[in-house]
Amino acid sequence: LFTPISAKMIDNVHLLEVIDALHPTPAVSGHPSNPSSLLRSKYEELDRGWFASPIGWFDSDGNGEFRVALRSALVTNESTTFYAGAGVVEGSDPDRELLETDVKLRALLGPVVASTKEDL
């Protein structure tokens, strides 16, 4: 599921200003964002890194396209860290949310395992 947003930019507004105003999305940050952010910093032990960050491109004419990085991996020489999440809301079933996250992470794991085997 996604909600495409398109717009004709106002001349004195840069695309990155719009991205900044839209980030983080309520789907990954909660709403309203300030109380949600405080709760996350209190209870969430993991640094989200680039998870749910806007990724995309823009050019000198003001054209561009961005997405929210809902699944990602941070690869270093020493380790690989995968990021995925589930939309936990009132009434969510924790077991189903965990299963959803597991399915998302497995989709990321396959290509990394395949490339590691080639390097051996």
Feature-to-residue mapping (PLM):
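Fold-independent oxyanion-binding glycine-rich loops
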Residues: 31, 54, 71, 84-87
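Hydrophobic alpha-helical bundle architecture
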Residues: 37-65, 69
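Contiguous alpha-helical scaffold segments within structured protein domains
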Residues: 1-41, 113-116
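Generic recognition of stable, solvent-exposed alpha-helical segments in well-folded globular domains
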Residues: 14-17, 31-35, 50, 65-68, ...
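Flexible loop/turn segments at secondary-structure boundaries
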Residues: 25-28, 57-58, 89-91
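Cytosolic ligand/metal-binding cores
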Residues: 1, 76-120
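Structural signature of FAD isoalloxazine-binding scaffolds in flavoprotein oxidoreductases
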Residues: 1, 63-76
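Structured core elements
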Residues: 56, 67, 74, 81-83
